[in-house]
A protein has these predicted regions:
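Conserved GNAT-fold acetyl-CoA-binding loop/helix
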Residues: 33-55
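A short helix-loop-beta-strand connector motif used in the catalytic cores of GNAT acetyltransferases and
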Residues: 57-70
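Acyl-donor (CoA/ACP) binding surface of acyl/acetyltransferases
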Residues: 1-37, 68-170
Length: 170
């Protein structure tokens, strides 16, 4: 099976998230915007983050060859965000998601990383469609999703969730 190993853009390296990234996963999952717009994943310790990586990210990657990826700024070597393509219950089309540490938001990294990952899954994995979901309140994500060429389709609700989400597709 084909697997994403390393992607590169002008300013970024993009790698599958590994156990060595537990400190970053813990930090980004506990930012106020992540909790508000994506949800509280109850990651409170490094061990919680390691288990989350093992039980969610690594299993998804092994099954599909793609999943959640770490975004590293080339010029500094800093871990700045994550971008991923996910096969998710309740969605017929894999969806793209992204998150950043607050100090790296609004610099175009989300578009750069997401566009590269989308290009890769369309070309190398034969995906014909991609989707995205976000809340009504998350205007920044809506803007990025639309900039990536996805179009709003409808409001949806994922299984076992009580939040209405905007559903986009390309």
């Amino acid at each position: 099976m084909k697997k994403i190993t390393k992607l590169e853009t002008e300013r970024l390296f993009i790698f599958p998230i590994s156990l060595e990234d537990a400190d970053f996963v813990l930090a980004v999952h506990n930012t106020p915007k992540f909790i508000e717009f994506i949800g509280d994943r109850n990651l409170r310790t490094l061990e919680d983050a390691e288990n989350y990586i093992k039980n969610r990210f690594l299993l998804h990657y092994e099954k599909h060859g793609f999943g959640n990826c770490l975004i590293v700024e080339k010029s500094t070597g800093k871990k700045i965000g994550a971008v991923g393509i996910f096969v998710r219950d309740g969605l017929d089309v894999p969806d793209i998601g992204f998150s950043f540490l607050p100090e790296f938001e609004g610099k175009g990294f989300g578009y750069e990383a997401s566009a590269k990952l989308m290009e890769t899954v369309f070309t190398d994995f034969g995906l014909e469609k991609i989707s995205a979901i976000t809340t009504n309140e998350n205007i920044a994500s809506q803007n990025l999703i639309e900039k990536l060429g996805l179009k709003y389709v409808k409001m949806i609700r994922l299984p076992d969730d009580d939040v209405d989400l905007r559903y986009y597709e390309k």
